[in-house]
C-alpha cells in the first residue's frame, strides 16, 4: 500500500505527524509513504522508516516570484513528482486551502482530509473525496493519528503515540566525554522569549551539576544572543551553524533540554529526550510538547519575564 502525505509545514506540525505513520505501519504491514513537505523540513520525514520518498515543495519561496522562469521550472518538476504515482490514498493533514489547491489537488488517488467543521480552513475540505470529522479539542498529534486511522481503516491505538525516529540517531551517537544539556533560547515571537538575565541565572545554577551546556542558533542575531548568554561561563559552548539533522544529533545526546516554545522543542520531544519547555502566551494543552518526559513550565500571567530561573532549575531535579 502506498500513501501520499500532504503536510508541508511548520516544523512542529510536521513532527506531530510522525506518530500517525507509526500507527499505520503497525496496523498495515508493508505500508509505504511518500510525503510532500516544505524544503526546509525535508530532512524530517526521511528519519521515519515508513517513508519511502520525500517530495520537497517550496510554496513559501515560490510565491515571491511565482511566474519567473526558474520558479515555473521548479513547479513543473514538483507537479511531475506528485503525479508520478497512483496512490492508494492521499491524506491531506495540513487542512489549508493553499496546500490542498497546490499539492493535494494534483495527486492521483482518493483524497482524505478533515471535514468542513474540523479542517483548519473549511474551504480546504472541498478538495477531498473523503471527509472525516476529527474533534478539535485534542492534541494535534492525536488529531492526526485519528485522521490517518479513519482514512486507512484501522482503529486508532489508545496508547501514547510513538514518533519512532530516535533510533535513527542511535547509530550516530559517539562517546561523549562530558555529559551536556542543551538550552534552546531562540524562537520567532518576541513574547515567547525568556529574558537573557533569566537564562544566565539558570546557566549559573547548572554550573554546579558538572554538566556542559550547548547553545544552538540558526540566525546571526541568535548567534549574538548565544554569545551573550555564554559570556563568562567556561562550561557553555556556542555551537557552530548546523543543519537540522546535525542539531537533532546534538539533541539526541543531551541529558536534558530546556527550551522556549519553538520547533526545536518539538524535535526534542520527538527524540524522546527529557525537556522542560517554557510557556508564556501560548497554551501547551493542544499544541505543546507531546511525548516521553515532556514537562511544561507555564509562567504567571502568561508573561515569561515572570518565570524565575530558580523555579525552572527546581524542575530539572
UniProtKB/Swiss-Prot annotation:
The entry lists its GO molecular-function terms as: ADP-heptose-lipopolysaccharide heptosyltransferase activity
The membrane-topology field of this record reads: Peripheral membrane protein
Provide the protein's localization.
Cell inner membrane
Per the UniProt record, which EC number(s) apply here? 2.4.99.23
Q: Which SUPFAM superfamilies match?
A: UDP-Glycosyltransferase/glycogen phosphorylase
Q: What is its main location?
A: membrane
Annotated GO biological process: lipopolysaccharide core region biosynthetic process
Query: Annotated pathway, please?
Result: Bacterial outer membrane biogenesis; LPS core biosynthesis
**TM ranges:** none
Which top class of enzyme applies to this chain?
transferase
Which annotated residues bind ADP-L-glycero-beta-D-manno-heptose? 187-188, 192, 222, 242, 261-263, 266
GO cellular component term of the entry, any: plasma membrane
One matching Pfam family is: Glyco_transf_9
Q: Which reaction does it catalyse?
A: an alpha-Kdo-(2->4)-alpha-Kdo-(2->6)-lipid A + ADP-L-glycero-beta-D-manno-heptose = an L-alpha-D-Hep-(1->5)-[alpha-Kdo-(2->4)]-alpha-Kdo-(2->6)-lipid A + ADP + H(+)
Tell me the keywords, alphabetical order.
Cell inner membrane, Cell membrane, Glycosyltransferase, Lipopolysaccharide biosynthesis, Membrane, Transferase
**Per its database record, what is this protein's job?**
Glycosyltransferase involved in the biosynthesis of the core oligosaccharide region of lipopolysaccharide (LPS). Catalyzes the addition of the first heptose unit to one 3-deoxy-D-manno-octulosonic acid (Kdo) residue of the Kdo2-lipid A module.
The Swiss-Prot or TrEMBL record describes its family as follows: Belongs to the glycosyltransferase 9 family.
Q: What is this protein called?
A: Lipopolysaccharide heptosyltransferase 1
Source species: Salmonella typhimurium (strain LT2 / SGSC1412 / ATCC 700720)
Q: Which gene encodes it?
A: waaC
Amino acid at each position: 500500500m502506498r500513501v501520499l502525505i500532504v503536510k508541508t509545514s511548520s516544523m512542529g506540525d510536521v513532527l506531530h505527524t510522525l506518530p500517525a505513520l507509526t500507527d499505520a505501519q503497525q496496523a498495515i504491514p508493508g505500508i509505504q509513504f511518500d510525503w510532500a513537505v516544505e524544503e526546509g523540513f525535508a530532512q524530517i520525514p526521511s528519519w521515519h522508516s515508513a517513508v519511502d520518498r520525500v517530495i520537497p515543495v517550496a510554496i513559501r519561496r515560490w510565491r515571491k516570484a511565482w511566474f519567473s522562469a526558474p520558479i515555473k521550472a521548479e513547479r513543473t518538476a514538483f507537479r511531475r513528482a506528485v503525479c508520478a504515482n497512483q496512490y492508494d490514498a492521499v491524506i491531506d493533514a495540513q487542512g489549508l486551502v493553499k496546500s490542498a489547491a497546490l499539492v493535494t489537488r494534483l495527486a492521483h488517488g482518493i483524497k482524505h482530509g478533515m471535514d468542513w467543521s474540523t479542517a483548519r480552513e473549511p474551504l480546504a475540505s472541498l478538495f477531498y473525496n473523503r471527509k472525516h470529522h476529527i474533534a478539535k479539542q485534542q492534541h494535534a498529534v492525536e488529531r492526526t493519528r485519528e485522521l490517518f486511522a479513519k482514512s486507512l481503516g484501522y482503529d486508532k491505538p489508545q496508547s501514547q503515540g510513538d514518533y519512532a525516529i530516535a533510533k535513527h540517531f542511535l547509530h550516530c551517537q559517539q562517546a561523549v566525554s562530558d555529559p551536556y544539556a542543551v538550552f534552546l533560547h531562540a524562537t520567532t515571537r518576541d513574547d515567547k522569549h525568556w529574558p537573557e538575565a533569566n537564562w544566565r541565572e539558570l546557566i549559573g545554577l547548572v554550573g554546579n551539576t558538572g554538566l556542559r551546556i550547548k547553545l544552538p542558533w540558526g540566525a546571526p542575531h541568535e548567534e549574538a544572543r548565544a554569545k551573550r548568554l555564554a559570556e563568562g561561563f567556561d562550561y557553555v559552548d556556542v555551537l557552530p551553524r548546523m543543519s537540522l539533522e546535525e542539531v537533532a544529533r546534538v539533541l539526541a545526546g543531551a541529558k536534558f533540554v530546556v527550551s522556549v516554545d519553538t520547533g526545536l522543542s518539538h524535535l526534542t520531544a520527538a527524540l524522546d529526550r527529557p525537556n522542560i519547555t517554557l510557556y508564556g502566551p501560548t497554551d501547551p494543552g493542544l499544541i505543546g510538547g507531546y511525548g516521553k518526559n515532556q514537562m511544561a513550565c507555564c509562567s504567571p500571567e502568561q508573561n515569561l519575564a515572570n518565570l524565575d530561573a530558580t523555579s525552572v532549575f527546581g524542575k530539572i531535579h
